[in-house]
């Protein structure tokens, strides 16, 4: 029999899993997500990506501010769910909620645990230069991403990949992984393995103060920094335009030939010298503008060889 599930998630990363579980016949008893927030130029309240997907499924949507009250617990228990599936919900579940579903709560986490427990595993894996990452289904416990692991999928991280690329691959793989995990849970065959305590690292939330690019660092470190923060919050530098420093987010780049002083533009194609080589910018964004290719940018704003980037 299909399972009766409570789904808990918020961003676009969680949507494929919600839709896949519904498509495979599971009964989505309720969808928990974060409250609508003001966004866009008009700062109108916008529902989360998961809320919008839940409406398409005609599933009940709940946006509690807390799960730590007696009322919230009673409401959660009233769904009489077999299990809860949690994907980037953005709120810590108290033990009483974890204990409520008969078969437990299962989280889809975007790393190869125990590496990169915490809030920003996709960013940190790229920024650290990891050769691979992945997605795991774990049975949740009271710790921070410390639960027993059920299933995993891996992907390679190449120099060309940004957080967007990793996000999209893992969202698709994760949806399939959770469907398989719930199928195994349904038939009583889901096997769990305790996480190793060797190799534990924590993926701290990204701080905007980290975003400025330091071109004195080695080339590959600069590339990883840029791709690990793309598109949000976006690694940035300042280009002198019409005599004024203008902040530019660098969204994509590649390792290029050439040398110069760190931060020096060394050709007419927005190739910038780093500590031991250079990167060539391929996509960027000015404040208030849409992302554009470096070629498009240079057509309207030529940057001469020898200019220093701040």
Swiss-Prot record:
Positions annotated to bind (6S)-5,6,7,8-tetrahydrofolate: 111-114
UniProt KW keywords: Protein biosynthesis, Transferase
EC nos: 2.1.2.9
GO cellular component term, pick one: cytosol
Protein family (similarity comment): Belongs to the Fmt family.
Record-linked InterPro entries: Fmt, Formyl_trans_C, Formyl_transf_N, Formyl_transf_N_sf, Formyl_transferase-like_C_sf, GART_AS, Met-tRNA-FMT_C, Met-tRNA-FMT_N
Database matches in NCBIfam families: fmt
GO MF annotations, alphabetized: methionyl-tRNA formyltransferase activity
Listed name of the protein: Methionyl-tRNA formyltransferase
Disulfide pairings: none
Coiled-coil portions: none
Reactions catalysed, as given in the entry: L-methionyl-tRNA(fMet) + (6R)-10-formyltetrahydrofolate = N-formyl-L-methionyl-tRNA(fMet) + (6S)-5,6,7,8-tetrahydrofolate + H(+)
Classification via Pfam families: Formyl_trans_C, Formyl_trans_N
Function recorded in the entry: Attaches a formyl group to the free amino group of methionyl-tRNA(fMet). The formyl group appears to play a dual role in the initiator identity of N-formylmethionyl-tRNA by promoting its recognition by IF2 and preventing the misappropriation of this tRNA by the elongation apparatus.
Top-level taxon: Bacteria
């Amino acid at each position: 029999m299909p399972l009766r599930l409570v789904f808990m998630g918020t961003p676009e990363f969680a949507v494929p899993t919600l839709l896949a579980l519904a498509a495979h016949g599971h009964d989505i008893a309720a969808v928990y997500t974060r409250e609508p927030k003001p966004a866009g130029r008009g700062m109108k309240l916008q529902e989360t990506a998961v809320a919008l997907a839940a409406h398409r499924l005609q599933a009940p949507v709940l946006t509690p501010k807390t799960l730590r009250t007696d009322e919230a617990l009673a409401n959660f228990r009233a769904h009489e769910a077999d299990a809860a599936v949690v994907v980037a919900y953005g709120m810590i579940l108290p033990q009483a909620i974890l204990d409520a579903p008969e078969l437990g709560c299962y989280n889809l986490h975007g790393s190869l645990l125990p590496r990169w427990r915490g809030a920003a595993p996709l960013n940190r894996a790229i920024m650290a230069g990891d050769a691979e990452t992945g997605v795991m289904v774990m049975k949740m416990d009271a710790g921070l991403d410390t639960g027993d692991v059920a299933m995993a999928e891996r992907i390679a991280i190449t120099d060309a990949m940004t957080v967007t690329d990793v996000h999209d691959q893992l969202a698709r793989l994760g949806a399939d992984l959770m469907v398989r995990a719930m199928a195994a849970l349904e038939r009583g065959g889901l096997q769990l393995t305790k996480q190793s305590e060797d190799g534990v690292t924590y993926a701290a939330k990204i701080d905007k103060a980290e975003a400025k690019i330091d071109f004195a660092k080695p080339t590959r470190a600069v590339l990883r920094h840029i791709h690990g923060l793309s598109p949000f919050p976006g690694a940035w530098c300042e280009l002198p335009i019409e005599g004024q420093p203008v902040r530019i987010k660098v969204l994509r780049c590649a390792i290029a030939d050439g040398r110069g002083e760190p931060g020096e533009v060394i050709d007419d194609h927005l190739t910038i010298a780093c500590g031991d080589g250079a990167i060539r910018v391929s996509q960027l964004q000015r404040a208030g503008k849409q992302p554009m290719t470096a070629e498009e940018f240079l057509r309207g704003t030529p940057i001469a060889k020898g200019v220093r980037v701040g």
